[in-house]
């Protein structure tokens, strides 16, 4: 892992690496690399190995590479390592030399700094020889499950007794772009089956409360998987493992390493199976397509789970429901003056703060706000179409945008341009209200630099309400009515005009309140001027 100068260090790293002894650091040393038995010349550039082939590989041809490398497992600091804070002996991620991705833009060779990655799908056959007392969870299916036992052949079976000092574990995984595993002699194993998927929960049991919390992870996974399959597209792999290990939470194909049994992290890391493991966007260049889409899915899954458990949202929860935290994070970043465009590569933000908010919060809001623009139901159809068209194909932002435009029938280039490529903000306000010839006239003003369509709610003194909708001319159309609620559609608001006047057939005296964007899905940086309450 490379370490450079940053104005705000990751608190989990800081200067800890520099304090490791020679026996505690991690390294990988390439001993040899052969192609079809012929040694190949290599050069090492930091964390990148360049191979100048002695013979070109023709299109459609097949070759076999054999690599011998030596590695030392570091004391766990980030992602991979031994003896983490929770006492897990080995958290084995980023443990082998991994192929760089080659796509339609060429080779992707960023230095690895323990953040995002972009990988090549392939089939893995991994054999691990380890002390017989260790228990392992990881990517893939255990091929020799009968010889191992420990719940892998049948739930509840113990680890098989063997006479040798080491035990052999053989995992196989198809169509994945990475492989992770963790090992500890004190691991416990919970197994559930749901809709053809084996759900493994592997953890260290400290006490009965800890065991109950991990049992809750298994129950929650069992509850939400059918919803995830229906909402985001069917999970295509035979198993998924929630494994205690690493630090925080980190996603891998068919598995995640978790610090603890918190369900928010559980749902987030599992959602990465869709928005990274199956779709495989370049999260180094477009982390919002990975972390942001995943955070949106996490919010939706968490809301579903809570509804199944009988929880109801508090009246004090800020709108939009399920995603309010993302909006708070984004608004704080805007106020800080540290905002950067979402086109910034993940490793090249000026601050970790801006990276985190852009990748997670603003990326999440990209989808909640897309629901505001095209309707939530159309947005959900877009996400399923995106899954169907682009899984296992490495989509770029333009590919997602094309799907969104095709499904919605609306022009959305402007949305990506403003929200992704700039730091311009949204701010609409109620300018003035008056009566003329028995009709009321409302003037709205665009104060921010980013244009949007407008949802408007009128409340009258008799407690009745009206929903009004002002399309944005840039979309060349409008969204359908939402939730079957009738509405009044007005002429388009031309994006070049800072003000808009709306006429409605009610006397001013009958009006009680006017509210812009009552669902709060629009990321208006100053909602204080969105509501006008009339005191008669």
Model-derived regions: residue spans:
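Short, hydrophobic/aromatic-enriched beta-strand segments in well-ordered soluble domains
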Residues: 61-75, 124-132, 169-175, 512-520
């Amino acid at each position: 892992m490379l370490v450079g100068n940053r104005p705000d260090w990751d608190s989990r790293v800081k200067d800890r690496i520099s304090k490791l002894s020679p026996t505690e650091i991690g390294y990988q040393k390439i001993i040899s690399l052969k192609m079809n038995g012929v040694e190949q010349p290599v050069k090492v550039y930091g964390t990148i190995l360049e191979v100048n082939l002695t013979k070109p590989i023709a299109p459609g041809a097949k070759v076999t590479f054999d690599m011998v490398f030596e590695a030392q497992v570091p004391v766990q600091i980030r992602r991979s390592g031994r003896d983490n804070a929770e006492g897990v002996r080995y958290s084995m991620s980023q443990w082998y030399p991994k192929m760089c991705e080659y796509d339609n833009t060429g080779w992707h060779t960023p230095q690895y700094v323990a953040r995002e990655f972009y990988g090549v799908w392939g089939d893995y056959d991994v054999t691990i020889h380890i002390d017989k007392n260790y228990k392992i969870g990881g990517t893939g299916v255990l091929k020799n499950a009968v010889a191992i036992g420990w719940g892998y052949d049948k739930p509840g079976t113990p680890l098989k007794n063997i006479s040798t000092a080491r035990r052999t574990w053989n995992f196989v995984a198809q169509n994945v772009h990475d492989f992770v595993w963790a090992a500890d002699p004190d691991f416990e194993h919970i197994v559930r089956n749901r809709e053809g998927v084996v759900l493994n929960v592997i953890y260290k049991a400290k006490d009965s409360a800890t065991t109950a919390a991990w049992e809750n992870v298994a129950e929650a996974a069992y509850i939400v998987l059918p919803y995830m399959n229906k909402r985001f597209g069917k999970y295509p792999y035979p198993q998924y493992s929630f494994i205690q290990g690493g630090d925080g939470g980190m996603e891998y194909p068919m598995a995640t390493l978790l610090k603890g049994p918190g369900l928010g992290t559980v749902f987030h890391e599992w959602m990465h199976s869709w928005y990274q493991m199956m779709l495989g966007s370049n999260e180094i260049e477009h982390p919002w397509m990975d972390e942001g889409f995943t955070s949106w899915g996490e919010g939706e899954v968490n809301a579903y789970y809570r509804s199944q458990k009988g929880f109801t949202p508090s009246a004090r929860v800020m709108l939009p429901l399920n995603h309010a935290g993302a909006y708070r994070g984004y608004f704080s970043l805007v106020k800080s003056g540290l905002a950067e465009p979402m086109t910034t590569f993940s490793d090249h933000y000026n601050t970790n703060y801006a990276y985190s908010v852009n990748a997670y919060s603003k990326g999440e809001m990209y989808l909640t706000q897309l629901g505001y623009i095209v309707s939530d139901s159309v947005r959900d159809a877009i996400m399923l179409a995106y899954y169907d068209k682009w899984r296992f194909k490495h989509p770029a932002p333009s590919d997602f945008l094309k799907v969104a435009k095709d499904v919605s029938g609306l022009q959305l280039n402007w949305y990506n341009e403003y929200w992704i490529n700039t730091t311009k903000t949204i701010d609409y306000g109620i300018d003035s209200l008056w009566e003329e010839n028995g009709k009321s006239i409302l003037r709205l003003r665009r104060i921010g630099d980013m244009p949007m369509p407008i949802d408007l709610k009128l409340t009258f003194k008799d407690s009745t309400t009206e929903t009004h909708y002002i399309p944005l001319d840039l979309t060349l159309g409008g969204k359908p009515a939402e939730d079957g609620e009738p509405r009044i559609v007005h002429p388009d608001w031309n994006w070049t005009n800072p003000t808009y006047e709306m006429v409605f057939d009610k006397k001013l005296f009958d009006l009680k309140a006017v509210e812009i964007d009552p669902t709060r899905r629009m990321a208006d940086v100053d909602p204080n001027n969105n509501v006008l309450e009339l005191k008669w």
